Amino acid sequence: MALLNILQYPDPRLHKVAKPVAVVDDRIRKLVADMAETMYDAPGIGLAATQVDVHERVITIDVSESRDELRVFINPEIVWASEARKVWDEGCLSVPDIYDKVERPDRVRVRALNEKGESFELETDGLLAVCIQHEMDHLMGKVFVEYLSPLKQNRIKIKLKKHQLERAR
């Protein structure tokens, strides 16, 4: 396993739309293992392949307190979302130290493949539902800050560029 470099907003590669995984093979399983290691090391609760500059439909998530309930979603698709919506404070490994409110469906049903290539469906709510939607946005080339006002987006870009310059010194 290896730690992968996480792209930082506003890197244009974060806006690439991920392609479906054709076959779940050893290359994809290695990607999943590397993504999980990277996510846990960061530390984060979710990571999309897009964030590590691999533009295939793969996400890893672990919202457990114990950090030992890894969930893998390959070629995920939301097949149902509740009309009820909820506002959550969201953050992102590609947008470090920035948190803001995003409104999303409160409950979703997702269909995907696991790391063995087996199809499954999961209906969930709460933090896991939010995380699935957030990571799936990455696969579509969207970062959570794009739900915010243009003014907030601009402030975030300025703040992140300032942090990048400070780290470069």
Swiss-Prot record:
Catalyses which reaction(s): N-terminal N-formyl-L-methionyl-[peptide] + H2O = N-terminal L-methionyl-[peptide] + formate
Active site: residue positions: 135
Metal-binding listed as a keyword: yes
Binding site for Fe cation: 92, 134, 138
EC number(s) given by UniProt: 3.5.1.88
Tagged with keyword DNA damage: no
Listed SUPFAM superfamilies: Peptide deformylase
Membership in a protein family: Belongs to the polypeptide deformylase family.
Protein name as catalogued: Peptide deformylase 1
Organism: Ralstonia nicotianae (strain ATCC BAA-1114 / GMI1000)
Gene from which the chain derives: def1
